Structures are given as structure tokens and as C-alpha cells.
Amino acid sequence: MCIRDRYMFETHIEQGPILEDAGNDIGVVDCVLGMFNYRLKFYGQTTHAGTFPMPKRRDAFFAASQALCYLHEEIDKLGYSDLVYTTGEVVCHPCVHTCVPDFFDFSFDSRHEDPKVLEKVLAIVKSCEEKTWAGCTCKVEKAWNRDTVYWDKKLVSYVKASAEECGIKHQYIHSGAGHDAQFAAYMLPTTMIFVQSKDGLSHCEPEYSSPEHCTEGATVMLNAVLKADND
């Protein structure tokens, strides 16, 4: 990361496979995608796992699994190849192997550049409240959301020019992950530079970016900072 006078540059690993798949070493980042996170909560009835007949059950875990499959099917029908969505956190109660769950809660995170696309996704998410799932009710609650943050166009051009002058293969790319720079962008001109992540892996032990790729990122940032300093 580099802050000089009125600019901010942040170099970061891509955390995805796009650069590696394209055979490019540097990502000229133009924005951080808009995103939202909601919680879907399902309410059923706890009963004994061995004594309560299947047709009479109100299994909140099973209800949530039906809803999650519904979300995947309906959102995929929208046809946006660059849209991503994830369920990464779940809560189950009473979470005992001898009990049918009476409560299940899962997170739903979705990200895209266009707010109109996210509105379509959100409409599908909210529709879960209107349905009964395996005899259970569903409540949809907003956790947080953020709008797409675009980087300063002049700084982005400096990053691209720097990569070109250094003879480093590069491409424009969006950031699907949130970064410190997106908050700085509300206060001063900001941009980012991505370097390759091996196999696109991040937030896990195999996460790796080679010293060579990191050096390229630092070189591109240095030259971009010098361009901004001479502006």
C-alpha cells in the first residue's frame, strides 16, 4: 500500500483465478463490486429424531436446504456469468443428533457491478419469505450492503501505462473482494493493482503468490506512483 500526498495505491493478490487463466501477470483494477449480505432464518419444530414420523415433521434444516436449492436455480436463470453468490455461514438449533432442528439460519452474499442485477437477485432472495418450506416459515433479514466503488480513472490509467512500459502482461479486472482502498476512495483518489494468485486460491492454507509476481506488482505500483507524483 502506498499513500502519497493526495493519492492512494494498493497492491494486493487477486484472490481469484482470472489473471492466471488468462495468462496475465497484473490486474489493472477498475472497481470493487457492489455486494449485499442477507440472513435467511427458518422456523420449524424440534421433535425426537427417532420417534416422530417423517410426514409430520417441520425440519428447519431440510426447509433451508430446499430454499437454498431454489435460490441457486432461480438466480442462475438470470443468466449473468459474472454474478457470484455464496452461503458461507450457517446456524442450526438445537444442533443435536437426536433432535429435528427447529431453527436454521444461513447467510447469503451476492456481488455484481450493476446495482440493477443485485436488485433482481435480492427480489429472489426476499421471495423466500412468501413461501412455506417443508412446513417451516422463513424470515429474510438484511445484514449489510455496499455499492460498487469505482477507482480514480487517472490513477487507473497510470497503472495500465506502467504495466505497458514495464512489458508486463496485464488486463482490466474488477475486484470481487472488499479492500481497505474502497473506504479510502471516499476521501481521496484511489486505485489498486492485482498480482496472480496460484490456482485462484485465497482464505485458505494453499494461498500463494510467487515472489516474481509480487515483484512485478511492486514495480508497477512504483512506476504508477512516480507518474502520479509528476502530475
Predicted features, each with a name:
Residues 8-14, 41-43, 194-196:
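Short beta-strand segments
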Residues 86-95, 107-113, 137-156, 176, ...:
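A short beta-alpha structural unit
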Residues 26-30, 93-98:
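Short beta-strand/turn micro-motifs at beta-sheet edges
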Residues 169-220, 225:
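Zn-dependent metallopeptidase/amidohydrolase metal-coordination segment
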Residues 6-9, 18-23, 30-31, 54-89, ...:
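Acidic-enriched catalytic cores of C-N bond-cleaving enzymes acting on peptides and small amides
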Residues 1-5:
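Conserved small/polar residues in nucleotide/adenosyl-binding loops
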Residues 36-42, 51-75, 108, 184, ...:
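Alpha-helical metal-binding/catalytic segments enriched in His/Glu/Asp
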